[in-house]
Amino acid sequence: MDIRELVHLGRYAVWNAFEGKEIKVPEALKEKYSRNMGVFTTLKTYPEHNLRGCIGVPLPVYPLWYATVYSSLQAAFQDPRFYPLKKEEFDKVLWEITLLTPPEELKVPKEELPEQIEIGKHGLIIEKGEQKGLLLPQVPVEYGWSPVEFLEYTCLKAGLPKDCWKDKETKVYVFSGEVYQEKEPFGEVERVNLK
């Protein structure tokens, strides 16, 4: 797998949206990235590295090529926390792609949850009723959170009280992610070490 192809595919999709052009993905690329996989696209300003958009497909329900196109378009234009990306910003943002493993529910006593979470490896999904929140593995590393803080902030992301992870009705899932980011816009793509 050449992750640069996925970053370029995401950029291509967003550029074509700016231009009002159809997104045509070559059959060879569709075939190469046909495996279903969860993926998130994160856009960051350059050189500040401030979040500019982040949306993805957490479950492996789409082929990787499609999930990359979809998440790139969503991160650029549909993240409700930000105004849609403007054409003049296109060469001032970094593309980051996170490839996800399928989530696994942690079925341990609630008080043991923090010791099951490995910062720098795991991302979290908290689910209670209809409410769900997800934070990628890189988030607690960037903010210096402990496993308990990671659980609390994921609860808040779900719109729930920060200690909801202790409730017996709450489900906690972990997943792993490989993070790849451009060093500079349109530049070399490298794997991000989360440890």
Curated annotation (Swiss-Prot):
Pfam families linked: AMMECR1
Q: Which organism is it from?
A: Aquifex aeolicus (strain VF5)
* Protein name (Swiss-Prot/TrEMBL): Protein aq_1444
Q: Which InterPro entries match?
A: AMMECR1, AMMECR1_dom_sf, AMMECR1_domain, AMMECR1_N, AmmeMemoSam_A, Uncharacterised_MJ0810
Which residue positions does the secretion signal occupy?
none
- The protein's superkingdom reads Bacteria
Outline the extent of the AMMECR1 domain. 1-191
User: Sorted alphabetically, which HAMAP family does this protein's record hold?
Assistant: AMMECR1
